[in-house]
A protein has these predicted regions:
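Membrane-proximal interfacial segments on either side of biological membranes
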Residues: 1-289
Length: 289
């Protein structure tokens, strides 16, 4: 059954034959998912090779690819410049799918099914800064504001493993499970470690974009692996140390204001009036994270 995956707007285009390089050439200015971009395609019929260049300043992405279409399984090389970082990928195009992988396949690999559209990718990083993700002009914020994820036909699963959080020495072993389905962006079942002492598990996580406000909301479960060592890190007096096993809480994080709000906090499955009063007072202060 035919279906519309996306609508591409073309504002200006030129198609001509390059007599110097013996190539059919297309140059066009376009917009897709509210993201403007420039596209250049060169077809070398003699060598059966297509060169493609994609550039979008809004999402800070440059892509160059060379594809040989002589074989049944078409192979090529993809060079990406994303947030000032270069990535080279090999890819294979079959009838209804595309497989891609970096030279070190453990670093990046994935597949794309064309119909219906589905993207799955696995990425491994040695380190990343949360500032790159959550600052106001970060690529994540720009992508959400572009509404590129609002298409009901985009289905994506990303598994991202990050060894270290470079701007927080205590945080490590971040696993992000990002799903995009029918316009919803979820981070459910993601997790991160605080040293070796706490595991922070995101049971539910959802990005909400409404009237230029971006919020991240969900439910956290914090499991104590070595609570004594955690207390020692903050030099907490032994008289105030509680032998707790687990903390649960709902949260809302406003990415525009960098403010957290918490609710429904439980310690070892038990709520407390004193704790509720403390959380309410914290929420009312409007402290910036």
């Amino acid at each position: 059954e035919d279906e519309v995956l996306f609508i591409n707007k073309i504002f200006d285009s030129k198609f001509f034959y390059d007599q110097t390089n013996l190539q059919n050439t297309l140059v066009s200015k376009n917009e897709i998912f509210n993201v403007p971009y420039k596209l250049t395609v060169k077809n070398d019929k003699f060598n059966k090779n297509i060169f493609t260049k994609f550039n979008s300043k809004k999402i800070r992405l440059d892509i160059e690819s060379n594809t040989n279409y002589d074989d049944i399984v078409k192979k090529g090389l993809l060079d990406l410049l994303f947030i000032n970082k270069n990535i080279s990928l090999d890819y294979e195009i079959k009838k209804n799918s595309l497989n891609f992988y970096s030279k070190d396949k453990k670093k990046l690999n994935g597949l794309i099914d064309f119909k219906p559209f589905y993207l799955e990718a696995n990425l491994n990083y040695d380190g990343i800064s949360t500032k790159e993700l959550f600052k106001r002009n970060s690529i994540l914020i720009d992508l959400i504001k572009s509404e590129i994820f609002n298409s009901q036909n985009l289905n994506t699963n990303l598994n991202i493993n990050i060894k270290d959080i470079t701007n927080f020495s205590e945080l490590n072993s971040l696993y992000l499970k990002i799903s995009l389905e029918q316009g919803n962006i979820t981070f459910s079942d993601s997790k991160i470690m605080w040293k070796e002492d706490l595991q922070i598990f995101l049971k539910d996580g959802l990005i909400v974009y409404d009237k230029d406000e971006i919020s991240f909301l969900g439910r956290l479960i914090i499991d104590a692996k070595n609570i004594d060592n955690f207390y020692r890190s903050f030099q907490i007096n032994k008289n105030y140390r509680k032998d707790l096993k687990q903390i649960e809480m709902d949260f809302v994080y406003n990415l525009n204001t960098n403010k957290f709000m918490f609710d429904n906090v439980k310690i070892d499955k038990t709520s407390s009036k004193k704790l509720d009063i403390f959380i309410n007072n914290y929420n009312n202060t409007g402290k910036i994270f």
